[in-house]
Amino acid sequence: MIQSQTYLNIADNSGARKIMCIRVLGASNRKCAHIGDVIIAIIKEAVPNMPLEKSEVVRAVVIRTCKEFERDNGMMIRSDDNAAVVIDQEGNPKGTRVFGPVAQELRQLNFTKIVSLAPEVL
């Protein structure tokens, strides 16, 4: 569960390393984000000489969470870290590579570009 003030690792090569969630997009009273949800975040750590810089406000989609996620068939999905991918306004990733596994639920949520860039789909 990702809520406000939660730090996430970035799982792509867009130039950001860590972000801090400031808002979960969706309903106005929504408190937590899960896999596949879009958040608004601030970049806290960035790679030098890259397009994204520290303290920039970006949109990101959550691809892995430490909190377990239950599928319809009863299978539980859990990861070692909270990770996200930086996206633009249309939902396309800003990076050209995605590191680590992603959940297959992203394909159903129309993030097919992220799924196609990922090395493994769970």
From Swiss-Prot:
InterPro entries linked: Ribosomal_uL14, Ribosomal_uL14_bac-type, Ribosomal_uL14_sf
UniProt keyword annotation of RNA-binding present: yes
GO cellular component: chloroplast; cytosolic large ribosomal subunit
UniProt entry tagged with the keyword Chloroplast: yes
Keywords, alphabetical: Chloroplast, Plastid, Ribonucleoprotein, Ribosomal protein, RNA-binding, rRNA-binding
GO molecular function: large ribosomal subunit rRNA binding; structural constituent of ribosome
Domain of life: Eukaryota
Gene3D superfamilies on file: Ribosomal protein L14
Pfam family for this entry, one: Ribosomal_L14
Compartments it resides in: Plastid, Chloroplast
Signal peptide as annotated in the record: none
GO biological process: translation
Role summary: Binds to 23S rRNA.
Family per record: Belongs to the universal ribosomal protein uL14 family.
HAMAP family: Ribosomal_uL14 (MF_01367)
Quaternary state and interactors: Part of the 50S ribosomal subunit.
Protein name, as recorded: Large ribosomal subunit protein uL14c
Phylogenetic lineage: Eukaryota, Viridiplantae, Streptophyta, Embryophyta, Tracheophyta
